[in-house]
Amino acid sequence: MGGRSLIAVAKSRMRWAPVRARYDEAVRHHPGMHRLLRVASVALIIAGVVILADVAATLAWREPVSSLYGSIQQHKAASELADLEASFPSSAGVRRAATVKSRHRKVGVLTDLFSNWVHEGQAIGRIVIPSIDLDVIAVQGTDTASLEKGPGHYPQTPFPGQGGTTAFAGHRTTYLAPFRHLDQLRAGDVIEVEMPYATFTYRVQGTRVVAPSDIGIIHRVSYDRLVLTACHPLYSASERIAAFAKLQRVSDVLAGPGG
């Protein structure tokens, strides 16, 4: 070690000497403090190791296995959605809705009919976000089993077309991680939600990181909007990231049986 390095080490020791002296003095007066600090240090180290081990396990095992499972579930959901798109238009309620003159009112009637058709875990539509290369089938419900199939519609929020805030939750890791790049959305990006009765086009307003307990983000506002939520940051559930988008237009409204 060179002379300058020895001098630097000596200066460092001198700088920390008062701190070390105060620590030693505190330990002498409070014998239990040293043990407490050691326990706290060990606990922090263990916590860090557990977090790193969980991330490693996710990358090495859960990601590929759950992605395979997610792919199978998406394939099943695609078939289920195709069946729904074929059967829903032929229902008696849709035939009656076809006679409604007002386009806006017709969308509302169709949406109300649809909401009574679906059940938890069932495929209900498709979410398409070109800017992050997302095209995924969404399901009804945000329980664990539903989210393993794809993004899930918050059942306490209305369907697109019923007015207010429509919200979906999705994974950012595992099970194909459909919302992995939610943080890359920018104001102006387009989101399409394709339902069996109409297609709803939204434009992103922005994103925000919130606490998991912040349910205010899915509350009703004065206009029709879409909210997408996911855990944040990656490999952690300590926070949530939410993307907000305002409804721009409604198209491809179901005309009736066969239309």
Model segments located where?
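Solvent-exposed, non-transmembrane regions of membrane-associated and secreted proteins
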Residues: R15, R22-A26, G32-G259
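N-terminal intrinsically disordered, acidic low-complexity segments at the extreme N-terminus
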Residues: G2-A21
